[in-house]
C-alpha cells in the first residue's frame, strides 16, 4: 500500500490520522473538563474520517466517503446533545469538572 494521493504518500496521511487519534484518546483519558473531553471525542471521530477518506481515495471507491457523511451527521448530533447536557449540568452544579459529577443525583 505505497500509493500516492495528490502527491502525499498514504502512509503519511495514515500516520497523521494515528497521531490525531492518539491525541484524542489522551485527551479523553487525562483531562477532567467535560468540554475538553467532548472536543477529544470529536478529534477521534475526525481521525477515523481521515482514514476512511484516505482508503476511499487510495482504492478508488466511494464507499469510504459515503460513510464519512454518516459519521459526520452522527458526530453533529452527538455534539448538540452533549453540549446541551453540559450546559444543563453546568447550570445546576456550577462546574464542568468530571470528578465533581460522580453522582447523577441533582
UniProtKB/Swiss-Prot annotation:
GO terms, biological process: ATP synthesis coupled electron transport
Keywords carried by this UniProt record: Cell inner membrane, Cell membrane, Membrane, NAD, Quinone, Translocase, Transmembrane, Transmembrane helix, Transport, Ubiquinone
Gene Ontology CC terms: NADH dehydrogenase complex; plasma membrane
EC number(s) reported in the record: 7.1.1.-
Molecular function via GO: NADH:ubiquinone reductase (non-electrogenic) activity; quinone binding
Pfam families: Oxidored_q2
Membrane-crossing residue ranges in chain numbering: 10-30, 34-54, 67-87
Membrane topology listed for this record: Multi-pass membrane protein
Catalytic activity field: a quinone + NADH + 5 H(+)(in) = a quinol + NAD(+) + 4 H(+)(out)
Subcellular location: Cell inner membrane
Family statement drawn from the similarity comment of this UniProt entry: Belongs to the complex I subunit 4L family.
Quaternary assembly: NDH-1 is composed of 14 different subunits. Subunits NuoA, H, J, K, L, M, N constitute the membrane sector of the complex.
Entry function: NDH-1 shuttles electrons from NADH, via FMN and iron-sulfur (Fe-S) centers, to quinones in the respiratory chain. The immediate electron acceptor for the enzyme in this species is believed to be ubiquinone. Couples the redox reaction to proton translocation (for every two electrons transferred, four hydrogen ions are translocated across the cytoplasmic membrane), and thus conserves the redox energy in a proton gradient.
Protein name: NADH-quinone oxidoreductase subunit K
Organism expressing this protein natively: Leptospira biflexa serovar Patoc (strain Patoc 1 / ATCC 23582 / Paris)
Highest classification ranks of the organism: Bacteria, Pseudomonadati, Spirochaetota, Spirochaetia, Leptospirales
Originating gene: nuoK
